[in-house]
């Protein structure tokens, strides 16, 4: 793995984990929880696997319209940007 990929994967996980303690609506909570689990798993993966799993996280986060909490929405926006960046094929 290149140095930037593991760091970005860690930051992605941290952004999603930060939503766990916030008052988020039920549907968003389920999707954020799934995305967090995938992000947690991908932290120890090879670059090609990170790209694939980041795409899964990106797709899960795309289904979240709003969280019902402004702080969680900010974490969601940062997580979306990180997942989008990590899902780019040049990270393979």
PLM regions: where:
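Acidic, polar-rich N-terminal leader regions of halophilic archaeal proteins
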Residues: 1-92
């Amino acid at each position: 793995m290149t140095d930037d990929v593991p760091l970005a994967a860690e930051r992605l996980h941290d952004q999603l984990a930060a939503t766990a303690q916030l008052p988020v609506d039920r549907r968003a909570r389920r999707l954020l929880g799934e995305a967090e689990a995938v992000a947690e798993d991908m932290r120890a993966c090879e670059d090609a696997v990170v790209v694939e799993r980041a795409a899964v996280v990106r797709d899960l986060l795309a289904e979240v319209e709003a969280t019902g909490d402004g702080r969680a929405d900010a974490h969601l926006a940062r997580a979306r940007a990180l997942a989008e960046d990590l899902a780019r094929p040049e990270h393979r």
